[in-house]
């Protein structure tokens, strides 16, 4: 009986907040709920996926490519006809927690409800209350552009059976409070594993390789485990937290590709305590325990790569790959260089990179280097100065990345 009364009171309180918020009037005590909801929406990076280039925030329409076709993100502004204006808090919670939309249909996991299911009801309600206050935008979005048969929603039943289990996060009493807060953010709202874990042929995360890195939108999302070479093992928790705030690890590396958007729209807005909690949790992730080859196979193009590096890169990054502190990042020991996939280094050489937090911008070399020359430089950098990555950049890979999206 007590539980029922509490639920009724909570529902009434939320209804009061959302009703007044939708009318532009806030009752006493509503502001903290809305501020918390805005903060949590930032933590979940909702705006990045639900905003098309040049479009209104949260109005949807962003193209999300998958191996099975593409989706367009839906409008989640409070517009009554094309957004979620007619959704109740229960409708919203069912979508976030169970992956079922207002019409009772299984949702596609381009919406990461397999991670958001861990978020508490109170936090989901706060996000809902906040979204009720954003500007309603009339924007009809035809979300489903998947190939047959994946375009048929009933096919999601098999995927859900294999890869989805609903359940709110439960703290581990044996772990410190910071670790538990970090786990809640990383495994829930932050949905870090969604991009940083490889997926199988059906689009399910390979749990045995969780957080070990994966290709996303043509970029390689780096290994987040405590691996000393390719992951975060050599980083302090403070360095990880600082990276989430600024997008730069001083004198080591900078964010690339989609991660730059994550920092810009999400992690830089988090509190120092939350960023540090996420860092503490990531530091505890075990590395890949499988045996690794101790010796990198010889690269027959190494001589060409060394010459090209000297002519095009050595002036800034120095002969020993150490860079210049605060001006040019080092390449020796750089986690981007050491990543399992060479794609990020290829893109940086080919397209350059904008100025970030003190580092001078890097020019693009794609206009003057052939695909073979870019591959030679990348392989040289990945196997020099103690770097022990595999020299697996090829001209064909460079060509594919040149033809792909930015």
Each model region followed by its residue ranges:
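C-terminal segment of classical bacterial N-terminal signal peptides
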Residues: 17-28
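Boundary of Sec targeting at the N-terminus
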Residues: 29-31, 38
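C-terminal structural cap/anchor segments
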Residues: 304-343, 347, 355-358
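Aromatic- and charge-enriched surface segment that lines or borders ligand/interaction sites
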Residues: 84-100, 104, 126, 233-236
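Bacterial N-terminal signal peptides that target proteins for export
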Residues: 2-16
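Acidic/histidine-rich, surface-exposed loop or edge segments in extracytoplasmic proteins
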Residues: 70-78, 219-225
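Flexible coil segments in periplasmic/lumen-exposed cytochrome c-class electron-transfer proteins
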Residues: 31-32, 43, 51-70, 102-183, ...
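Active-site/pore-lining binding-face segments in mid-to-C-terminal subdomains
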Residues: 345-372
